[in-house]
Amino acid sequence: MRSGNLCVRARAIAHAFTVCRGAAPGVTRPFGAGCVPAARRGEAAGETKSGQAIKRETMGKAKKHAGLAVLLAVLLAGCQSGPQRRPQTVIDGFAQGGTYHIVLVGDSTSGGLKGQLDSLLWRVDNSMSLYNPTSRLSRINRGETDTLDRFIANCIRTADTISRESGGRYDITIKPLTAAYGFTGDRPVQQPNVDSLLQFIGYDKIRIDGCRLVKKHPSVQIDLNSIAQGATADYVARWLDSLGWKDYLVEVGGEIFARGHNAKGGLWRVGIDKPIEGNVIPGAQLQVRIGISNRGLATSGKYRKFYTDSLGRKIVHTFDARTGAPVISNLLSATVVARTAAQADAYGTLCMVMGLNESIRFLESRPDLEAYLVWSDDRGNYRTYMTPGMESLVLQ
């Protein structure tokens, strides 16, 4: 945790990566009343990964390093000419296999926050991580427990709403597919028998009964990677709200919630990366900068999270739960601004599943969502689509 000469630090980071360019929340429903607390210390032994899992996590976390782009965008925005009107403090660290960054604006004391924050993030990770074999979600998937904590319960409720809105295009029960294709640290199957897996996939195959998860079949498994980091940003934001912070930015693995205003009294500035293969350094090549406040933001794309199998096929991480097949489309990335970061995270994934035209039709029916889509035309040229509200957020 630091305060003081943030401009010097920002420029040092930017130089190291040869770039000088940047990148009441709450979950959709309240915390599950009466549910047991999230995993406590001693309940989970921490993450243990095989070499294959480490390789998959490094390759598969498409947004884990996006925090650097966000941090640079925030810090460098404060390095422009003119006085910095209010002090700000930066807290950063590691969580969920990636990084987190928090910027707090104001004079309120921030002593001891990092320790409390790391404790919160530890509890979330030991709840929802698929890479941690002792997490609550991992044990639920193995059938060792059916008891939900508030983190998993809230994600399931939010996901269920979006699954119903999308006719099942978005679905968190795709764990058998993501595992078969090697996106959850499991060893990929060269030619998965998709038909045999589809019988265990479907949002209607799970329901919450009190604090228990009821499955229609023991082999039904959940993958929260499309919503967990956004939900984590929301949890941190709610915690900061409870402490009285009015102006802050929370970023977890690239998913963002911004409250109030930055140190200069303006919107929080966030950079969106160009969705080109090889663009592995967040902030090195920006598509656009936008300003947000009191909203969540997330970007989904297929330009980082993929692998080439032994047959030379590019396998992307986005699946259509109805067919079980990886999605093939000309939509390269989808950035969504929503009421919460969890919603933005999930709706961004939904757009990638639906593709360009269906996403546009869906967004036109949803005035509560703003989006910035990047797609490729038949000649390979990059094109963009923005909702009317997103156009007003773009910074010139």
Predicted regions located by residue number:
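Short, Lys/Arg-enriched N-terminal segments with co-localized hydrophobic residues
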Residues: 46-58
